[in-house]
Amino acid sequence: MGDVEQQVRAYYDVAGPAYEALMGPFWHHGELASEAAGLSPAESAKALESKMVAAAGLQSGGWALDFGSGVGGATVHMASVSGAHFVGVSNNEWLSQRARGYAAEQGVSDTVTFHTIGDEDYRTLAAWPDGSLDAVTWYESVVHLPDKAAFFRAAARILKPGGRLVGVDWLQRPFGEHQTDEQIMRWMEPVNRHISIPWHGTLDGYRAMIEDAGLVVEVAEDLYTGVQCWGSTPPEDGQGWYEYDGEAPEVFAEGKRALDDARAAGVFTVGKFVAVKPA
């Protein structure tokens, strides 16, 4: 038990510095309209975060958990625009340390904290009592979990009645000529292998897991319906993935190449989810 989670933690020992160097504090896809309008990856990411905060109904004084908070960009922005208290968690202390530093730089250490949890603590989130939080958020982090359903059950438990689960995540899907599992996995298996992902879910699969956890799904949306999901990372490598000269550059070059291939095939996408705990 825990081998996959340990692998993910070890991956981010190396990937964390690379991601921060290449992407800054914001590591997820942005709002599609903002990307199309030519906004920077960071501004597009903030635009999506602001929409997710609104969907969560977070207000000043509320309490939220941001799961898989990385180096803190999304967590800090959500706290800043909502006035809510946020706790960001990951299983990698280097990430947590960088996130704490970023929160201090942005002047929000009084409302945003970051904690490192155990490799398998996502299965229960036992540090949080039943019905204690107004929202649970995540950005492209649940994809790394082998037992995604356990996380959704834990999130549902710690939400207050009326509290909301909101997030975005990497997904796989049939697209164009790639319709069978075998055809899809031709492109997705290398992504899994190079980016330390046990398996990608589907839009319907995530909806089912969230509903099985006892939440009512209000939104389950493919953010790139009918189009290839390039986001802010087009194949011309504007962020410099192939020029990265830090530790293990070949790891990130291979990951970038595999992900670009899956994007080009159309079988990779990003989904948005909003769910509420019944009162």
Locations of regions flagged by a protein language model:
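N-terminal auxiliary segments of SAM/dcSAM-dependent transferases
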Residues: 1-18
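Conserved alpha-helix/loop element of class I SAM-dependent methyltransferases that forms part
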Residues: 29-33, 39-60
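Class I SAM-dependent methyltransferase SAM/SAH-binding core
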Residues: 63-65, 74-122
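A short acidic, Gly/Pro-enriched loop at the edge of an enzyme's catalytic core
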Residues: 123-136
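A short glycine-rich, Lys/Arg-flanked "PGG" loop and its adjoining helix->strand segment in the class I
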Residues: 149-164
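Short, glycine-/aromatic-enriched active-site segment of Class I SAM-dependent methyltransferases
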Residues: 171-197
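Short alpha-helix
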Residues: 198-213
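Conserved Class I S-adenosyl-L-methionine
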Residues: 219-279
